[in-house]
């Protein structure tokens, strides 16, 4: 099994089919605590305070820029919900799972 957090996102401009439900389920096994909700990969990260939450969000923004793949974020005082989907393909792609693994690696720092 590949360490997704060490993989790099591939440019995606559409013309590629999204993962099937089975493909997404198979990829989900490589991630801890993530779920597929309404066709999006989602996870809620808890933090001790607002400072830690915002430090995570800012670091994630840098990773997202570097990978050119950006999540939808919902930020609260001590939590951040991260959702990934690939708009260009209208569903989930490998890039979503790569970035989810990078989120987990960041959270574990």
Predicted regions and their residues:
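Charge-rich alpha-helical segments
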Residues: 1-109
């Amino acid at each position: 099994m590949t360490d997704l957090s060490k993989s790099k996102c591939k440019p995606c401009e559409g013309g590629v089919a999204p993962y099937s439900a089975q493909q997404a389920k198979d990829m989900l096994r490589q991630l801890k605590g993530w779920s597929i909700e309404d066709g999006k990969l989602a996870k809620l990260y808890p933090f001790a305070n607002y400072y830690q939450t915002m430090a995570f969000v800012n670091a994630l923004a840098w990773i997202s820029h570097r990978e050119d793949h950006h999540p939808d974020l919902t930020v609260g005082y001590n939590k951040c919900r991260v959702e990934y989907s690939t708009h260009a393909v209208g569903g989930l792609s490998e890039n979503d799972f790569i970035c989810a693994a990078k989120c987990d690696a960041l959270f574990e720092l």
